[in-house]
């Protein structure tokens, strides 16, 4: 019977109630339709080949809009008495308030803006519970360099690779041995290893620290502290607190770059501070959302960092013995990548991935030689991956946020025999060979073997041909690698996942082959591992560990 027909036979005193009963299904249908529309839009986004963080954000927005639709329906169309409507709407938004900046719960995010953990907002952060300072050693340490050192960010090359060792593939028969595991301060710094010692950077309360450990025992032997703490609000808070860069150990000195721009030179044997610069203050540069992250680069007698100033002081070189400024050049904001030294067209130059350009500087003078546009925003779709020279004056570029990787060709013409960049006759150009949606690294970097590039594309292991950019395979495992880090060791890739799992993968261009795995540490892990011979150091913002990995005999040379 229709609503009209029922109304004709309904007593007047019941008309209002019956009409409401007829209208209510339409109101429910509107709410269900709104939810269905949001679900469909979210599904389309998740089925599209875009960055995982965009997918997660779309889901969060959809949930907020769904709650908004439900609360609007309760207030306007539910038929509940007025006090009950307001209480019900408030109850719906209570979980949102709980995790808001005003609520009692602080969420710990992973690299895709997903939720990895939580803690009570009033509880002290992990780094605030640790010992702040460590006394310097009473005797100077004996630092002995070896051919297995891992002395800086990514070791000794353009990508993380350890040569001269091979790893056992069967970790059931040959288990990695845990030598030590202990709490460390916050931050995303990696370890630099020389001889029997390893150095990293940590945040402990209000002190940004440089800490030296015994490699095989984890014993702290010296530390240096600066009164600094990078703990940004807003979107920057997603990156957490503490230093990001990895120390550089060179010629008995430890060079460090803190998240607030403090550049230190420290005596490796004693932990004594030799010289220091507060670079952002001295050069009038502003920090970037997630803090200064580039690791110091040694170039001859200088140590070079990206200051990010806009007035001919984007890249700055300091005399590594005295700390005096040697030169400053460039006018771009920093990214989160580190400068590298290479040679292109017979000219030594420093490559710096800036906010939205790849810039090449003459190694001796800092003069800008050439630039190549590279889409980025250091407060948004930031660049954090290294430029990779691959031979033939070509450079491989990659980053996250859905930006395509590129292989570019650099050419120098009209050479006059003088140092490049000192005469107008020197002309440089950079042209794109290919640009494809492969190997879209975000926090990590790629490795290269036999003309094949391996890396983590968003959250999946990826493999592509260097010459063409053609993808050979892409693999999503469970649990996912997330925004982890990788090291090439012979014919194997050692991956440290975002959740702290150690995964051994064959460097096979034909298919993904997982050889072994081990849960190494717990918590969000963006730090690069360091491998010295069989000794692997891993860490995150809460704990560090050293494993002795089983070695396999090196293949014989015929």
Where are each of the predicted segments found?
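Aromatic (tryptophan-biased) beta-strands that constitute blades/sheets of beta-rich domains
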Residues: 121-183, 209-236, 272-281, 285, ...
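Extracytoplasmic beta-rich repeat domains
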Residues: 173, 179-192, 204-207, 223-248, ...
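Blade-level signature of beta-propeller repeat domains, shared across WD40, Kelch, NHL, RCC1
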Residues: 403-405, 500, 524-558
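Loop/turn-rich, solvent-exposed surfaces of beta-rich toroidal or solenoidal domains
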Residues: 403-405, 436-507
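Internal/C-terminal transmembrane anchor helices
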Residues: 82-107
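Membrane-embedded alpha-helical segments of integral membrane proteins
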Residues: 30-79
């Amino acid at each position: 019977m229709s609503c009209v027909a029922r109304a004709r036979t309904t007593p007047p005193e019941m008309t209002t109630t019956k009409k409401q009963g007829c209208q209510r299904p339409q109101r429910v249908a509107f709410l269900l339709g709104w939810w269905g529309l949001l679900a469909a839009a979210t599904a389309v986004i998740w089925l599209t080949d875009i960055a995982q963080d965009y997918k997660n954000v779309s889901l969060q927005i959809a949930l907020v809009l769904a709650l908004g639709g439900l609360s609007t329906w309760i207030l306007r169309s539910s038929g509940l008495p007025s006090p009950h409507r307001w209480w019900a709407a408030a109850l719906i938004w209570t979980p949102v308030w709980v995790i808001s900046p005003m609520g009692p719960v602080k969420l710990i995010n992973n690299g895709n803006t997903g939720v990895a953990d939580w803690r009570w907002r009033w509880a002290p952060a992990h780094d605030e519970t640790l010992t702040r300072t460590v006394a310097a050693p009473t005797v100077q340490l004996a630092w002995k360099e070896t051919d297995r050192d891992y002395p800086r960010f990514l070791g000794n090359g353009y990508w993380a690779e350890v040569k001269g060792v091979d790893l056992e593939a069967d970790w059931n028969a040959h288990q990695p041995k845990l030598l030590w595991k202990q709490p460390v301060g916050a931050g995303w710094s990696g370890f630099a290893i020389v001889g029997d010692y390893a150095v990293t950077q940590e945040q402990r309360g209000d002190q940004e620290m440089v800490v030296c450990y015994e490699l095989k025992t984890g014993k702290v032997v010296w530390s240096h502290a600066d009164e600094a703490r990078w703990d940004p609000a807003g979107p920057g808070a997603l990156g957490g607190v503490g230093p990001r860069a990895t120390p550089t150990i060179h010629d008995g000195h430890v060079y460090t770059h803190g998240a607030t721009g403090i550049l230190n030179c420290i005596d490796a044997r004693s932990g004594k501070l030799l010289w220091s610069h507060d670079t952002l203050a001295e050069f009038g540069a502003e920090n970037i959302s997630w803090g200064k992250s580039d690791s110091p680069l040694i170039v001859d007698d200088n140590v070079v960092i990206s200051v990010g100033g806009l007035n001919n002081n984007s890249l700055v070189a300091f005399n590594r013995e005295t700390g005096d400024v040697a030169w400053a050049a460039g006018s771009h904001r920093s990214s989160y990548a580190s400068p590298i030294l290479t040679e292109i067209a017979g000219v030594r130059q420093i490559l710096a991935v800036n906010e939205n350009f790849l810039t090449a500087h003459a190694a001796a003078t800092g003069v800008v030689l050439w630039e190549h546009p590279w889409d980025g925003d250091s407060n948004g779709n930031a660049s954090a991956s290294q430029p990779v020279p691959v031979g033939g004056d070509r450079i491989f570029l990659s980053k996250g946020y859905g930006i395509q990787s590129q292989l570019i060709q650099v050419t120098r013409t009209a050479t006059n025999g003088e140092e490049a960049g000192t005469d107008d006759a020197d002309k440089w150009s950079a042209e794109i060979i290919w640009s494809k949606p492969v190997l879209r690294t975000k926090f990590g970097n790629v490795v290269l073997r036999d003309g094949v590039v391996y890396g983590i594309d968003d959250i999946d292991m990826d493999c592509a041909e260097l010459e063409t950019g053609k993808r050979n395979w892409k693999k999503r495992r469970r649990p996912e690698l997330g925004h982890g880090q990788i090291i090439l060791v012979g014919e194997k890739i050692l991956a440290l996942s975002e959740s702290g799992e150690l995964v051994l993968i064959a460097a096979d261009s034909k298919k993904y082959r997982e050889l072994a795995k081990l849960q190494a540490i717990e918590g969000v892990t963006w730090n690069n591992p360091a491998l010295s011979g069989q000794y692997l150091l891993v860490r995150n913002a809460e704990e560090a560990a050293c494993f002795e990995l089983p070695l396999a005999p090196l293949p014989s040379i015929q």
